[in-house]
Amino acid sequence: MKIYFLLGIFLTFLLHTRICQGIKWLALAKTPLSLALNQSQHCKQLEGLVSSQMQLCRSNLELMQTIIHAAKEVKKTCIKAFTDMRWNCSSIELAPTFHQDLERGTRESAFVYALSAAAISHTIARACTTGDIPGCSCAPIPGESPGPGYRWGGCADNLNYGILMGSKFSDAPMKMKKSGSQANKLMHLHNSEVGRQVLKASLEMKCKCHGVSGSCSIKTCWRGLQELREIALDLKTKYLSATKVVHRPMGTRKQLVPKDIDIRPVQETEMIYLQSSPDYCLKNEKMGSHGTHERQCNKTSNGSDSCDLMCCGRGYNPYMDKVVERCHCKYHWCCYVTCKKCERTVERYVCK
């Protein structure tokens, strides 16, 4: 009986270690700048890749520096987006191993998968525009006219190529046969697609003025993506309203359906999760919670960074902080500005 018990623990461990393979590639953010990626055997030196991603690396070496940059952008952008929340995305720094906040099918892992999918396609699309990827250039000029007084020009972000190559790489782990439970694979693939949908929706017309004395008689326009930080904020809104789902039979196969209203299928645009998260008030390394003790809070805010919410009702302590700012700035003809440095004391607050 003891053998079966230990075997059960081992199988459970294997299942959990496979669950988050889809974002292990974020470990690429740790890749040293000194690593040259000009030969296929260099792919073996990259951390966090599954076999199918390793193959993509070997056959698309020219993409790898861009994908490494995408991994760095995911980490930076996630931490920035959640700086005012109890869960502050700091556990993303642990890649390629994670705590349960990103290892299980949580709301937090839903956000990171969506952001990762959006970021890799965004970064590749932008790299095409800047000429950083051989064989990939600006997006084709649209067939329709931009309107009177406007003309197509510039270099549009190559979103189609970004999504094609980005999804091949980021979705590869979830499409492997041995990549965790079917429910988790479906959840992560769904949220990755949500990330790409938000990315597509961020494509907007950008224009530059031309004309005598700045008259802007003609505008040259192209289609460009919003900055990744703006896309992350849209995804954060979806995170806050995410739907909890269950994996149950629907017709001839199992599908993910909303837990509380399982009479309808999951909407393509909604972020979903399988397992509820803790409140992240107290430190619990296993759960990926650093707690909010000594986290800075905003005494006058009504949002998630307010001292009431951030401190989970434990109260807060004030402290005085010295801030150095530019002051007494003067404009000099022509054309520069000089400023002095001024110091002032401000009151800040940290959670008990």
Swiss-Prot record:
A biological-process GO annotation: cell migration involved in gastrulation
Pfam families with a match to the protein in the record: wnt
Residue numbers carrying Sulfotyrosine: Y273, Y280
Segment forming the signal sequence: 1-22
Subcellular location(s) of the protein: Secreted, Extracellular space, Extracellular matrix
InterPro entries: Wnt, Wnt_C, Wnt_CS
Lipidation (O-palmitoleoyl serine): S213
Miscellaneous information on this protein: Xenopus and other lower vertebrates contain duplicated wnt11 genes (wnt11 and wnt11b) resulting from an ancient gene duplication event, but the second copy has since been lost in mammals.
Function: Ligand for members of the frizzled family of seven transmembrane receptors. Shares much functionality with wnt11b. Signals through a non-canonical Wnt pathway to activate Jun-N-terminal kinase (JNK) to regulate gastrulation movements. Acts in a non-cell-autonomous manner to control neural crest migration, probably acting as an extracellular signal from surrounding tissue, but is not required for neural crest induction. Acts redundantly with wnt11b during pronephros induction. Regulates cardiac morphogenesis through the activation of JNK, but is not required for cardiac differentiation.
Family: Belongs to the Wnt family.
Protein name as it appears in the record: Protein Wnt-11
Source organism: Xenopus tropicalis
Lineage, uppermost ranks: Eukaryota, Metazoa, Chordata, Craniata, Vertebrata
Name of the gene this protein is made from: wnt11
